[in-house]
Amino acid sequence: FVYGTLTCSVGMVVINFALDLSLTLGASVALATTLVGVLSACNGLGRIVCGILYDTTNCRTTMLFVTLVTTGSALSILLALQTGSLLLGVLGMCLAGISYGSVPTLSSAFLIGFYGIRDFATNYSVANLRGLIGSFVPTIAGFLLQSSGTYVTPFLLLLGISIISIPLNFMIRRP
């Protein structure tokens, strides 16, 4: 649950910032709007990739993949902000979309794999509370952006969240 909440919150922040972040990195309004759509498409792609990876490997490998993609997103955007590279920003947004899209697929596969189909609807409903809890992170990130005047500060927060999720991959045990 904590893992899903952390990973989900990174995606929520990037989705929230995507348009203005693209403009900050030099995209035209038309391109920035298109990039928000690309991020959304990557969300859908993440669901498929995560499902295939889970079915062909295992839970831990899939979680590690999602964690690396999430961390790569924060790092790419931080590098984009430092260098002014729109291309790195686009990469980071695409990775965030893939990561964010992976969470629902990973959650449902994880729940069935660990707890079976019995009470799946209840378990999945509880797992989806990650969106409620994670929704506070964009508010915090927005406050950090406003108080610091730069996107670097909120993306350092996202990098920290991503790094915190790494050891969670190794702490999860079948009940």
Regions found by a protein language model. Give the residues of each.
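C-terminal ends and interior cores of transmembrane alpha-helices
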Residues: 69-82
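A late C-terminal transmembrane helix in Major Facilitator Superfamily
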Residues: 114-148
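Intracellular juxtamembrane helix-capping segments at the cytosolic ends
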Residues: 102-115
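Cytoplasmic membrane-interface "Motif A"-like loop-to-helix N-cap segments
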Residues: 55-68
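Extracytoplasmic gate region of multi-pass secondary transporters
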Residues: 1-50, 137-141
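Helix-to-loop junctions at the C-terminal end of transmembrane segments
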Residues: 47-58, 145-146
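A membrane-interface helix-boundary motif in multi-pass transporters
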Residues: 143-161
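Multi-pass alpha-helical transporter architecture, strongest
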Residues: 159-175
